[in-house]
């Protein structure tokens, strides 16, 4: 059995690193609030990096779950551990242009405390330029000094680059503001965010506020402007479908059977004390790689509430019939998935050898 596994691993490496195969890889830039170590943000980076059909052009890092500089450090260290330091890590926005922690705290005092406030959360609050000691050890590599990276890449690879967004949309809003052609030159925008209906869950966080979602809430003005930009295609993985997923102890035990660097990272930093996590961003990434994972979807016009009232940051959606024609664009909204296939795909990717740079 060990010899058979070795043969499969060698075959995987030969295919993934062959010149012809590399030319067929789909290009993506990951924009992510890369909190870590472990957890769904790091596992999303691995989902895309581990796929032999994906070429990760770079990772832009935006404040969200944690502050940007802390997230950059986690990302650099992850790439060191899996041997992919060739992928540039580009620091993005530290703060949303409009929202600040003070405003977020005042909003919660008036309208109710949110379940998760990311970098602003009292439970782990620190100043934006403080980097706590990393459990995985400090990175030895440095972030890339790449001003305008997002814009430069979509101009270099016209209509070939998918923008994967797993955090607040601050970086994308800034890119659109600097270059009005940014969105139209990309292949597509794929993002995790928003909530479009009442999710099928007993989780009180989402039952009481089904249209509230952290990525939109952290920077609603950015999300609204990005969703109004002229993308060729927009695909949304909302809360509704995300809460149907969860990384389980059984999945981690299966991953533990592999000695790949990705597998060892996932196992070491699995946050078991919280009973596993919804696989929000991993699902968005996996469904971009293999759209057949999604078994039900809809199309709605989508925007974000920016009135600074009780619904600030909430998701707004319309059908073609009731669309107010105020700039919202049509978005493909995922509604259901083949959960068994998704779980298997994630486990298999984590157990596989990491594709080399090309």
Describe these PLM feature segments.
Residues 103-112, 203-207, 251-252:
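Short, surface-exposed amphipathic charged segments that create phosphate/polyanion-binding patches used
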Residues 87-137:
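Surface-exposed loop and adjacent secondary-structure segments within mature catalytic domains
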Residues 23-77, 84-85, 122-236, 242:
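Active-site histidine-anchored catalytic micro-motif
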Residues 11-20:
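Hydrophobic h-region of N-terminal signal peptides that target proteins for export
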Residues 24-26, 43-55, 214-358:
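Conformational coupling and interaction surfaces
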Residues 1-8:
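Bacterial N-terminal signal peptides that target proteins for export
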Residues 42, 69-73, 93, 101-105, ...:
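Extended, subdomain-level signal for the structured scaffold at the beginning of enzyme domains
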């Amino acid at each position: 059995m060990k010899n058979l596994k070795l043969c499969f691993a060698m075959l995987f490496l030969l295919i993934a690193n062959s010149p012809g195969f590399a030319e067929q890889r789909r290009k993506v830039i990951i924009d992510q609030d890369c909190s870590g170590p472990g957890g769904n943000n790091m596992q999303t980076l691995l989902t895309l990096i581990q796929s032999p059909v994906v070429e990760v052009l770079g990772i832009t890092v935006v404040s969200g779950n944690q502050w940007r500089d802390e997230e950059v450090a986690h990302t650099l260290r992850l790439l060191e551990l899996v041997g992919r330091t060739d992928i540039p890590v580009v620091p993005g926005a530290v703060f949303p242009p409009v929202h600040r922690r003070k405003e977020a705290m005042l909003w919660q005092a008036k309208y109710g405390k949110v379940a998760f406030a990311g970098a602003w959360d009292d439970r782990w609050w620190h100043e934006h330029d403080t980097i706590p000691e990393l459990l995985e050890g400090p990175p030895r590599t440095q972030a890339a000094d790449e001003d305008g990276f997002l814009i430069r890449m979509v101009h270099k690879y016209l209509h070939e680059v998918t923008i994967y967004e797993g955090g607040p949309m601050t970086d994308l809003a800034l890119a659109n503001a600097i270059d009005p052609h940014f969105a139209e030159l990309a292949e597509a925008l794929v993002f995790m965010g928003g909530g479009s209906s009442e999710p099928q869950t007993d989780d009180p966080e989402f039952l009481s506020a089904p249209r509230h979602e952290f990525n939109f809430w952290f920077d609603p003005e950015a999300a609204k402007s990005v969703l109004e930009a002229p993308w060729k295609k927009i695909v949304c993985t909302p809360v509704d479908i995300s809460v149907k997923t969860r990384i389980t102890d059984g999945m981690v035990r299966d991953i533990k059977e592999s000695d790949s660097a990705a597998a060892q990272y996932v196992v070491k930093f699995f946050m078991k004390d919280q009973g596993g996590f919804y696989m929000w961003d991993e699902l968005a990434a996996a469904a971009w790689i293999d759209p057949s994972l999604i078994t039900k979807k809809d199309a709605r016009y989508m925007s974000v509430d920016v009135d600074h009232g009780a619904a600030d940051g909430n998701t707004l959606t319309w059908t073609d019939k009731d669309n107010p024609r105020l700039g919202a664009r049509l978005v493909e909204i995922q509604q259901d998935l083949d959960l068994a296939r998704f779980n298997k795909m994630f486990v298999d990717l984590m157990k596989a050898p990491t594709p080399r740079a090309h």
